[in-house]
Amino acid sequence: MTTITPEAARLRLAQYLSPAFPTGGFAWSQGLEWAMDQGAVTRATLPQWLEDWLDHGAGWCDAVLLSLALRRGADHAELDDLARAMCPCARRLAETVEQGTAFAANVAALTGRPQSAAALPVAVGRACGCLPLPAGEIIGLYLQAQAAALISAAVRFLPLGPVEGQAMLAGLQPALLAAAARAGTADPKDLASATWGADLAAMRHETMVTRIFRS
Amino acid sequence: MRGRRLSGPMFDAIAPIRMQRSRGAASVRLGPRGIEDLAQSGSAKAMLPRMTAGRPEIVFLNTAGGLASGDRLDYRIELAPRTQALATTQTAERAYRAKDAPAQIRLHLQVGEGGWLDWLPQETILYDGARLGRETAVDLAPGAGCLLLEPIILGRLAMGETIRHLQLTDRRIVRQDGRMIHHDALALDDAALSRLHHPAMLGKARAMASLALIAPHAADLLEPARAVLDEPGVTGAASAPPGRLILRLLADDGWPLRRQVIRLLRVLRPDPLPRIWQV
């Protein structure tokens, strides 16, 4: 493959992880919609929900999966099995696989290299492993994109202004960087979570009668 | 010589004084006509009560009466092709304060082709300062399935105990025909404890249980399971990713959790409950 400068790699990464990159990310909320609907997450407590997601939940697990998928010699088929096996509910599985599959199809169209369907962090890691950028930078940007998608869901659901949402994202950045740095050197034994409340929310979202989001 | 100690409700709140680390290993192999091999050493025992009806039952017991720093417990079950069994534990497993190395539990559960294992252990009770690493590895042959329960209680609410320090890693990995199909790992440490009351974490719950049923018909049990998720004092939910039914339960205390688990087990399995799970 052709070599790419770090500056060009940064542009490519920002493109892949932009909300405009067509992966359908706007349609999912990881159960946040149910938690907001129940009043368990409000404008005041959303930052706390996001921190738990990042340090002890799906955000952390995605970061570790991405880190493993970025490594030289990574077995992406095996990591994809792992990513799917880790999803505790049907909608979370659909969320990560449908976005990852769309991501892989986009990358295949752009690069001319075929990419099989995979869970999102595995598809991103497989596509970005060749970029001459530190793993922590790629993971940090991925986590920020995921957090931004959750905040965007909250802006559409709650009384929460878009600028206030962006302020929440800015407030989360030190924690995003810290989690990205930890994930950069993590191993498969670090794939563990403690966010059962968020898992319950994602499961219960499946039985919501009226909903905006697919998860 | 191993450090044995008294156990039972009277002694639950008392930190054990243990001079030596305990080791235990118990291994059972069952075939369609019954027991094929049984090996046990140290503090681990495996009992096979004579059954008059239903599936054969395996009951594990840790005679050390709990787990402290550096203790290690290995349980192993091997079911031959077309063999069905139920395995459980004689008592709740207690993890006490551990100053140095965490206690370790390793479970290796193998189910042969067309076989079935119900792994329905009693609660794991974690005391303040407990350090425990548990790894449950399940290997299913093609056409095999299992039901896995894992109830965990944080301290004893009835005794007013609160947990200030904890290190728990509890990982369950199921492979079928060598391919990973289920991975569920819970990690609780001091950093997580400080946030435990958050709604994304455990909320007010101090008892929790996961249930995973791995079988082609798992999705058929989703609605029946959801229909009984209404035990007072328990918040639960279920979902069925392909080939799996997964339940998470959060409860105020161990008793409502146990009542909810029993009601779910009656829906999820055709056979009578093991004696230990009857109330």
UniProtKB/Swiss-Prot annotation, chain A:
A family per Pfam: UreF
Main location as per UniProt: cytoplasm
A cellular component term, taken from the record's GO annotations: cytoplasm
Subcellular location: Cytoplasm
InterPro entries: UreF, UreF_sf
Function of the protein: Required for maturation of urease via the functional incorporation of the urease nickel metallocenter.
Stated family: Belongs to the UreF family.
Subunit structure: UreD, UreF and UreG form a complex that acts as a GTP-hydrolysis-dependent molecular chaperone, activating the urease apoprotein by helping to assemble the nickel containing metallocenter of UreC. The UreE protein probably delivers the nickel.
HAMAP family per record: UreF (MF_01385)
Stated name of the protein: Urease accessory protein UreF
High-level lineage: Bacteria, Pseudomonadati, Pseudomonadota, Alphaproteobacteria, Rhodobacterales
Gene encoding the protein: ureF
UniProtKB/Swiss-Prot annotation, chain B:
Keyword Cytoplasm: yes
Higher taxonomy: Bacteria, Pseudomonadati, Pseudomonadota, Alphaproteobacteria, Rhodobacterales
One Pfam family, short name: UreD
Protein origin, superkingdom: Bacteria
Quaternary structure, from the entry: UreD, UreF and UreG form a complex that acts as a GTP-hydrolysis-dependent molecular chaperone, activating the urease apoprotein by helping to assemble the nickel containing metallocenter of UreC. The UreE protein probably delivers the nickel.
Family according to the record: Belongs to the UreD family.
PANTHER family (UniProt xref): UREASE ACCESSORY PROTEIN D
Functional note: Required for maturation of urease via the functional incorporation of the urease nickel metallocenter.
Keyword Chaperone found: yes
Keywords assigned: Chaperone, Cytoplasm, Nickel insertion
Organism, scientific name: Paracoccus denitrificans (strain Pd 1222)
An MF annotation (GO) of this entry: nickel cation binding
One GO CC annotation: cytoplasm
Predominant location category: cytoplasm
Protein name: Urease accessory protein UreD
Subcellular location: Cytoplasm
